[in-house]
Amino acid sequence: MMQLPERVEGLHHITVATGSAQGDVDLLVKTLGQRLVKKTMFYDGARPVYHLYFGNELGEPGTLYTTFPVRQAGYTGKRGAGQISAVSYNAPVGTLSWWQEHLIKRAVTVSEVRERFGQKYLSFEHPDCGVGFEIIEQDTDGQFEPWDSPYVPKEVALRGFHSWTATLNRNEEMDSFMRNAWNLKPQGRDGNYQRYAFGNGGAAKVLDVYIDEDERPGTWALGEGQVHHAAFEVADLDVQAALKFDVEGLGYTDFSDRKHRGYFESIYVRTPGGVLFEASVTLGFTHDESPEKLGSEVKVAPQLEGVKDELLRTMNDPIVI
C-alpha cells in the first residue's frame, strides 16, 4: 500500500464523555492542575450539556482534554475494545512519588509505580466516571509549558500529553492504517503494547496500542465513561483536505465532512480498529475571550445568546472552581 506524505503532526485533543461538570473540574483542575480554558455547550439531543476544555495557559494542541459531562442527559455506553483506553500526561523525572501522594490525598485510587518502554508511570481512573489516566516520567526538554496552577506546584506540574493508548482485539488492519494513512511509525513492542510515533516522537507525538483479544467491543455512541474521539493536529485546511482525499484513496472512506467547532476545524474518520480519529486545524481560544479571561464565561453560538440562561438552568450542572 502506498504511504502518504507526513501530514499529521501529533496529538491535538482528546474528547471524553464524562459524568458531571464538577467531577471534571475536581480532577482536571483541582487535582491535575490544568486550566479550564473554555466553557461551551453541546446541543445535540433533547438536553444541552457542557463542552469543557482543559489544558495549559492558552489550551495549546497537545494539552487539550475536552469533556462532555453527560450523566444528567442520560447518555450511557460501555468501555471496551475499539476505544482509547488511557490518556497519559508528561511529568518531570523524579516527581512520581509526589504525584502518587497527591492523588491519594485527593481521594484518587492510584497504582504503584510501574514501567513500560523503559519509562516509569502511574495509572489511575477518573473518580467520577472511570476513564483511564496515566502520568509518565519524561525529561522536560521540548515539552509544553504548564499552567501556573494554584493547586499544583510548577516544578512538578504536568506538561501536556505524553501519549494515548488504544485497546484493540487485533492490530493488523489498524497497523496498516496508522503507518500508511496517518504517518505513524512503529517504535517497538513491550508485552501486549505496540508503540507508534510521529516523526522522532516526543511530547504529544506517541500513540500506543494495547492488544487484548478477549476484550469485548465498546460502544461507539456518546456515553458516560468513554473516550469519544482522538484528535490529531494538521497544519491548515489545505493539508486537511489533502489528507482526506488521499486517505479516502487508500480505501478508508468513512470520513465526515468538515465541521466548524468554533475553536478548530475538524474532519472525522472511523479507523479499522474502531477508534474515531479526527484531523483538526487549530483556530485558538482567544477570539471570544482574552487570555486572562479564558474559561470565565459560558460561550454559546450568537443565535443562542438570548436563551443562554435558560439553557444553563435546563442543564443544571453547576461548576465551582
Swiss-Prot record:
Binding, Fe cation: H162, H229, E278
The alphabetized UniProt keywords are: Aromatic hydrocarbons catabolism, Detoxification, Dioxygenase, Iron, Metal-binding, Oxidoreductase, Plasmid, Repeat
What are the EC numbers? Answer: 1.13.11.66
**VOC domain sequence ranges:** 10-138, 160-282
Question: What molecular functions are annotated in GO for this chain?
Answer: dioxygenase activity; metal ion binding
Induction behaviour:
By chlorohydroquinone, hydroquinone, and 2,5-dichlorohydroquinone.
* Family as reported in the entry's similarity comment: Belongs to the extradiol ring-cleavage dioxygenase family.
Q: What is this protein called?
A: Chlorohydroquinone/hydroquinone 1,2-dioxygenase
Q: Which gene encodes it?
A: linE
